[in-house]
Structures are given as structure tokens and as C-alpha cells.
Amino acid sequence: MITAQLNNLVNQLKNYSASLEKSNILIDKPWTIIDDDNEIQRLIFKKDKSLILSKNGQVQIGKWDYFPEAKSLLIDRFSDKILCNEAFIDEGILILKLDGTNNNHFILANQNIIPDLNILEYLNNQRKNKLNLVGFDLVDGNKLEVESTEY
């Protein structure tokens, strides 16, 4: 369910995606991911290509590199290395797809912008803002969204 909803939101927002070629989006920000154990991990990408990884206060130092020709981010997490391709990028969220997969996402939220880490709500709000959508509650309980022509 979340994967389908996430894919739908990413498809609607892809024309508004930034790129990691502008490294100021990535560097020196508190990027946060909720891992498979439902624990929060924080990643801080440094200008010198080092990567600070923190989980439960335990820190490891990894490395990262960006390959603009492939729009891919290589992340060396000390225990493993992963290659991720850009799916959707903005100042609040990095949605990356693990290379060679269709639906295996690596999602990082900028905790300064999304303090509650609710990425679906953030993306839905971005979708409404970028696409100028206005929502209406219908009497049958459904919602109707239409594009607003007012700016």
C-alpha cells in the first residue's frame, strides 16, 4: 500500500524534482531514515565525501560519492555499500531507488524540514502545492481534488 502510494506521489512530482548535482541539497543536513527494525538512523553527508551514520547514539563513519552521469549516489555504510538512483529530490526529502530494483526505495527525510518524519503527508502536501490542487469533501465521504486556476 505504502509503496503504491509512494510510487504514485513520486510520479506526480517527478517534474518538480531537483538533482543531487546541486550538492547543497545533500551536504550538512540531518537526513533521517527509519530502518527495517523501525529504528531511526541519521546520516550526515559531509563536503569531504565522508558520511556520519548515527543509530541510537552509536556513530560510524562511512563515505559517499555522487555520479552525475548516472544520477546515482554511492553510499558506503561501513557494513555495506549501496548504489541508489534519484527518484525524487527536494530540500525536505530524498527518495532514491536501489539500483536494479523497481520498488525498493531508500527514503531519507530532512529532519529540519520534516520533524515528524511523515514522508507521505509531506509528499502529499508538496503534490497539492506544486499542482495547485484544492480538495473538497463530498457528502459520500470521498474527496475531490481539482486544479485551481487562481494563483
For every predicted segment, state its role.
Residues 1-61, 68-151:
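Lipid interaction determinants
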